[in-house]
Structure formats: structure tokens, C-alpha cells
Amino acid sequence: MKYRKKPVVIEAVQFVDNEESILKLSELGLDPVRVDYADLDNPVLKIETLEGVMIATEGDYIIKGVQGEFYPCKPDIFLETYEEFELLNILDSI
């Protein structure tokens, strides 16, 4: 059988190691926002999930799921799977 994903609106922030990105992640509800600097050239974001700690690297999108959970998504997969909702709303109203 084939299945299609239900259309779901999600919230997401692209992780970049800067103050603006960290603030947006906090505003999204990720608490705590834990950036690990063990490798100074490659900081990673550690996200607590039901499956354990997930690691996001710079450029990954952090998605807030429909039940309030958070998980990372690689940029190529994110851009293939999602489109900006505000833009979609504008186009639908034309």
C-alpha cells in the first residue's frame, strides 16, 4: 500500500551557532538550548527526545512536532519536505 503524509504545519528554526538562532530556538520552546563546543570548529546542538539525545549540526533545521517534541532534520531533507507556510497562504489567496 502507498501512503501520503497528512498536510501538517510545523514550526522550525535553522540551527546556526549565533545568538539570534539560539534565541529563536528558545522562543520555539526548546528548553534547555544545549550547544556543545567539545569541537570548537564544529559546535553541535544536543536535543533531548523520547529516544535519547539527538545531535544537530550547524545548518540543520530543528523542528517542533505536532505533540511539542523537537528533532533535527538535515537541510536537504527539510527543503524537499517542507515549504514556507506564509508564502503558501499568500499564493492560495490569489
For the regions a protein language model found, what residue spans apply to each?
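N-terminal domain-onset segments
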Residues: M1-L50
